């Protein structure tokens, strides 16, 4: 069965930056499952998978414009510390989900000042070309529920209410934050299966 829209694909992969640094991987023993054609992966990787089948293994270079986009200086902001109420100690490198008019946006603290914090809303791989080694582990039909929800439900998945955020995130009032539970990877917002 060839990878096409509305099929569930299980893939193992490694992704490296141009200088060879491994930034994420999912081994054959724990492949990433996603619903093809629903924007769960960065465009360049999803496009490269189209037409492949179980057992195929290949390398693909994904340019920044088909990955996490260009680095945008406008996504770096200086905000008052009190925006992070309830967080005892703010440190460089901490990640949060900021609630915005466009929905939750992952941000990373890049500087901590006396009264302010500098946050960067760019994905940590923004502006970088990426090299993937991919193995298609399996391809199957999606269930009706998976098609309705637009993502894969595995044996360890849980049912959710519509409106819940991805990776356990949920909405807050404007400018509130919560810790992000994902990490960088081939998904559109940092976690491999989340967007």
UniProtKB/Swiss-Prot annotation:
Top enzyme category: isomerase
Record's keyword terms, sorted: Chaperone, Cytoplasm, Isomerase, Metal-binding, Nickel, Rotamase
Tagged with keyword Isomerase: yes
Pfam family, one: FKBP_C
Region listing for PPIase first part, in residue ranges: 1-69
EC number: 5.2.1.8
Residues the record lists as binding Ni(2+): 166-167, 186, 192, 194
Xref: SUPFAM superfamilies: FKBP-like (SSF54534)
Chief subcellular location: cytoplasm
Region annotation (PPIase second part) ranges: 129-151
InterPro entries in the record: PPIase_dom_sf, PPIase_FKBP_dom, SlpA/SlyD-like_ins_sf
Record note on domains: The N-terminal region consists of two globular folded domains that contain prolyl isomerase and chaperone activities.
Stated family: Belongs to the FKBP-type PPIase family.
PANTHER family: FKBP-TYPE PEPTIDYL-PROLYL CIS-TRANS ISOMERASE SLYD
Protein name, as recorded: FKBP-type peptidyl-prolyl cis-trans isomerase SlyD
Species of provenance: Yersinia pestis
